[in-house]
C-alpha cells in the first residue's frame, strides 16, 4: 500500500493539490527536469542521495563464522540480502535502511536490494547503513532508493559493487516540505505495521531454526 501511494504521488504526480484534487490529472503544471530526465511539477527541484541521508558505514563490523559461533544470541546479524545469523549484542540501535553494497546488489527489476530494519541489530560490511535526515522517514527513503536503476550506480560486471560515492551523487526528486510531511503522516502507520509483522516473522524464523535441530536429534518431541 505504501508503494502504491508513493507511485500515485511521486511517479504519476497525483498528490493532493491545494484543493485536495490529484495534481497532474487536474491540470497541474509540469516542467522538464534535465537532471532527472523527466517532467516534474513546476517549481519542484532535484537533490542528491547525499543530501537526504546519514551514512553509518564506518560503524559496521564484519564477523567471521567462527566469531559468530562464539557470540550466539537473539540479535539479528544482517548481510547484503537479509539476516545471516543471530548474535548476543548489537552495534546499532534505531531505524535504518540497508542498501546492498557488493555481491548481490540488484533485484529482478534492476533496482537495489534494500532492507528496512529497526531495533537492536548487528550489520556487516556488505550493505550500506543509511538513516534519513530530519524531515524524511525511513519508509520514504526506502521508496526513493527503490526507484534507482542499479546499472547507473554500480561498478564491475561480474562482481558488482555500489560504492558510497556513486550512491551519494545520484540525483533524485526533491519533494517540497509540506507535501513530504503529508505523505509521511499518511504512510507512517503502514510502516509501523510492516515493521511489527517483520519482527514477528523474524521471531518465528528464529524459533523454527532452534526447534528443528531439537526435534531431529530427539531432544524435543511433539505430542498428539
Model-derived features: where do they sit?
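Non-catalytic DNA-recognition/assembly elements of restriction-modification systems
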Residues: 1-5, 27-62, 67-79, 177-223
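A short beta-sheet element
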Residues: 79-83, 89-168
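Internal hydrophobic scaffold segments of catalytic domains
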Residues: 1-10, 85-90
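Alpha-helical scaffold segments that mediate packing/assembly in large oligomeric complexes
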Residues: 4-30
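Proline-centric
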Residues: 39-42, 127-135, 150-152, 165-193
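Short coil/turn segments at secondary-structure boundaries
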Residues: 20-25, 63-70, 155-159
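Structural beta-strand/beta-sheet cores of well-ordered domains, especially the beta-sheet scaffolds
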Residues: 11, 42-45, 59, 73-76, ...
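A general structural signal for short secondary-structure junctions and capping/turn motifs
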Residues: 53, 65-70, 87-91, 119-121
Amino acid at each position: 500500500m505504501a508503494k502504491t501511494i508513493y507511485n500515485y504521488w511521486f511517479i504519476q504526480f497525483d498528490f493532493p493539490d491545494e484543493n485536495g484534487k490529484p495534481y497532474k490529472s487536474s491540470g497541474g503544471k509540469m516542467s522538464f527536469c534535465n537532471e532527472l530526465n523527466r517532467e516534474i511539477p513546476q517549481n519542484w527541484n532535484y537533490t542528491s542521495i547525499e543530501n537526504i541521508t546519514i551514512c553509518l558505514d564506518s560503524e559496521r563490523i564484519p564477523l567471521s563464522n567462527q566469531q559468530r559461533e562464539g557470540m550466539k544470541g537473539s540479535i539479528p546479524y544482517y548481510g547484503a540480502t537479509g539476516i545471516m545469523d543471530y548474535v548476543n549484542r548489537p552495534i546499532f540501535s534505531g531505524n535504518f535502511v540497508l542498501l546492498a553494497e557488493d555481491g548481490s546488489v540488484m533485484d529482478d527489476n534492476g533496482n537495489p536490494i534494500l532492507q528496512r530494519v529497526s531495533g537492536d541489530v548487528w550489520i556487516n560490511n556488505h550493505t550500506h547503513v543509511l538513516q534519513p535526515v530530519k524531515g524524511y522517514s525511513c519508509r520514504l527513503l526506502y521508496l526513493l532508493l527503490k526507484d534507482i536503476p542499479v546499472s547507473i550506480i554500480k561498478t564491475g560486471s561480474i562482481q558488482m559493487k555500489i560504492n558510497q560515492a556513486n550512491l551519494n551523487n545520484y540525483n533524485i526528486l526533491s519533494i517540497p516540505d509540506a507535501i513530504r510531511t503529508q505523505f509521511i503522516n499518511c504512510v507512517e502507520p503502514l510502516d509501523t505495521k510492516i515493521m511489527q509483522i517483520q519482527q514477528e516473522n523474524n521471531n518465528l524464523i528464529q524459533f523454527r531454526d532452534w526447534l528443528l535441530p531439537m526435534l531431529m536429534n530427539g531432544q524435543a518431541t511433539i505430542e498428539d
